[in-house]
């Protein structure tokens, strides 16, 4: 009777080991399949503008990736808010005035900064934080993320993250891919670093130095394309 009992224990142990091994194999296969199904295709963010101040068409691929990874491009069409965002790669002498206007009108904004901006305009970054604005990650060197490995992306993102935290005790949570270029892989990976991707639903050519200083044109473009829960992108590097 004792021999039979020992035999059953041995058989049961073997079965448990077998079942556990199969579970681990299946789990690994599922992880590999999931990782391999993430697209590496480079995408340049773009939108199709709508008329009558309606929300634009983000495009099916853009929308799917943003929704899947809980990013932000625009909000609920029934909410009358806008997201005001600025990309700050370098300082051209206009940010202080922009901050003054925002403060005067009690308007919060988000500024996406690079390491160069942090190192050369840290006083303005401090002012942004002190006045209640959000600071976002625009990476260390403003490189196109689809060109980078995950390890390189981690360095580009987290080196800046650490520098901002050490300098201001401020933890960034939002990232804007440099040049508006991304892939599903890069968005998925930056998610694992604790970041939400922020894109936009309105932009115009304010970055072109040859087209700057056109106040009437700028107002017309903005007012004609404003829509509920719009996400505006502009820069602090041109004369308005």
List the predicted regions and their residue ranges.
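Second-shell loop/turn segments in exported
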Residues: 84-85, 89, 113-114, 142-151, ...
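N-terminal pre-catalytic segment of deacetylase/amide-hydrolase enzymes
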Residues: 2-85, 91-104
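Hydrophobic packing within well-folded, soluble alpha/beta domains
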Residues: 111, 128, 135-138, 153, ...
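Structural recognition of the beta-strand scaffold that forms the well-ordered cores
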Residues: 82-85, 109-113, 134-137, 173-177, ...
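Acidic (Asp/Glu)-rich catalytic clusters
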Residues: 75, 98-106, 118-138, 190-192, ...
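Loop/helix-junction capping segments adjacent to catalytic residues or to phosphate/diphosphate-binding pockets
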Residues: 92-93, 118-122, 147, 184, ...
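Generic structural signal for well-ordered alpha-helices
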Residues: 69-70, 99, 122-126, 157-161, ...
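Alpha-helical scaffold elements lining the catalytic groove of polysaccharide deacetylases
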Residues: 94, 143-170, 181-228
